[in-house]
Amino acid sequence: MTNTELFDLWRARAVEDPDLLTELDGIRGDADAINDRFYRDLAFGTGGLRGVIGAGSNRMNIYTIRRATQGLADYINAAGLPKKVAIGHDSRHKGELFSREAARVLAANGITAYLYPRLEPTPALSWAVRYLGCGAGICVTASHNPAKYNGYKVYGADGCQITLEAADAVLAAIDKHDYFDSIELTDFDAAVAAGKIVWIDDKCLRDFVDAVLALRPGNDVSKLKLVYTPLNGSGLEPVKMLLDRMGVTQVTVVPEQEKPDGSFPTCPYPNPEIREAMETGLKLCDTVKPDLMIGTDPDCDRMGSAVPDGKGGYRLITGNEMGVLLFDYICRTRIGNGTMPKDPVAVTTIVSTDMATPIAKKYGVELRRTLTGFKFIGEQIGFLEAEGHPERYIFGFEESYGYLSGAHVRDKDAVNAVMLACETAAYYAAQGMSLLDAVNALYREFGFYRNALESFTFEGETGMHKMQGIMAGLRTSAPKTIAGYKVAEVVDYDTDGTGLPRADVLEYRLVNGAKLMVRPSGTEPKIKVYLSAVANSEEAADAINTAMADAAKDWMK
C-alpha cells in the first residue's frame, strides 16, 4: 500500500482514540507529514519500541501497542513460557492507557497480566517479573527522551531486557499481524473481574526496596543533607521510601519537579546527564547547600548528581565518574567488612571509562566489558547465576548514568544508585572529603581518564538514510589520523572477532592511548560519538577529547 492509502486506512479504522483522528485530519494533503508517519513500521528490537506519540505505523499509539503485544503473546505461548506478564509505566503521556491496552491483549490470549496500579520505576518492573514468576515483562517508558516520546520495553523471564534472539522471534510474530483485524482483545474491566488482569499489590514494591537495602554496606548517613529531583517522573515514591529507611532525614525535594508530569515543564529533555535537566535543582542547592544533589530520570533507572565544587557552587558528576566512585567504594568497603566474594566480577561496557580497568586490578576483581546497553550487563549476571555463583557479581555500570550493585534486578536501578551515592558521600564526609575530593583522588591515583560524548541528530526518513551513509563511509574510508594523532587500530564490532555479539559500532584507537567510538543510537535518531583520553592532567585529556570531537563533527556534515 502507498503511504496515502495507509493514511486513508488509518483515518477509517483508528477511531478509538480521538487524538489520532484529530492529528490525521490535521495532516491531510501534507505528503511529508504523512510519509513520516507511514513510511515504515516503528522498529522493534532488544529495546522494544520507542517513538513519537501519534498516529501512524511509525508512531506510538494504541494500535502499535496492541500489535506488538499480540506478537509478544504469540511468542510466549509458542515458547511455553509462564503465561504471566508484569506491566508497568512511568509518568509519560498515555503511559497508563498503553499499559491497559497491552493487558487487554494479553488477557485475550490466555496470559495473565499483572499490572502496577500506578506509575513505578523500570527497575521495579524488572523486579516484578522475577518476583511474580512471569514469562515476560512490559515497561511503557521512553526513559529520558523528550516529552513527545513514549516506548515499550520488553523483558524476559529473567527480568532482563530481551536478547537479540528473543527480539527477532517476537518481531517475526509481530510481522504476521496487521494493526486492526488480527489482534485478540478483551474488555479491561471484565478481564479484571475474571482474574485475567491482576493488580500488583504494594508488597511487591516494598519488597523491592527491601532487596535494595539488603545491599547496603551500612555506613551512617544520618548527617547527610540531600536535594532530590525525580524530574516529574516515577522516582519519588520508591526513593523517598528508601531514604526514610536509610535514615536520610534532611531531604529537600525540588518542588517544581516533584509531581509526575509527562510534559516535563521545567526540562524538555528530562535526562539527568545534562545540566538543563538539573538546573532547577542546582538553583535550589544555592539556598539549601546540600552535601549532594541527586536526580533520577522519568522511569528512575538513571541517576545524575552534583556536589559542592569548593567555590560556592555545584559541579555535576559524570556517569563515568560516579561509576568509578561507586566501584571503588564497593570494593574497599566489601573488603573492609569481609563480604567480598571469592572471584568477584564487575561489568561495564565498551564505551565506559577505561579507569575501571586499573581499579579492578587493584582490588583483584575480574572486569568484563559488554556491548552498549545494560541488558548485556544483566546478561552477565544471568551467566553467573547459571554457573551457580550470582554472588560473584558485585557491580555494573555504564557511562550513561546506569548502576547496579546486586542481582535483585537485571537492569540499571536508580533506587539502588541513590542508596550507593548516599553511602559513598557519607563515607567520604566522615573523612572530611567531598565526592569531588574523592573523584580527584582517583584521578591522581589512576590517571586523568576523561570522557566526552557528542550526539548528532538525524530526523525522519532522510535522516535515517544519512546515518546509514555516514556509517558506511567510515567503514569504506577509515580515517588514518584523528586530531593529529595516527590511528593505531580500527575495530569494527560488526565484522571483527571481538568475542561480543555483532553490533554497528566502530572504534578508533590512537597511538597516544586515546579512543573514539561511533555508533547509531538504538533508541533515538542519533549517531553517538564516545571520546576517551588519558593524560597527566584533566586539561590535557580534555584538550585531546575536544580535538577528536572537532574531527567527528566534520564526519557528520
Sequence positions of predicted segments:
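An N-terminal, well-structured beta->alpha segment
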Residues: 5-102, 109, 191-192, 197-224, ...
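Gly/Ser/Thr-enriched, mixed-charge loops and adjacent short helices
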Residues: 33-38, 42, 150-279, 284
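Glycine-rich phosphate-binding loop plus the immediately following alpha-helix
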Residues: 155-185, 320-344, 348-359, 414
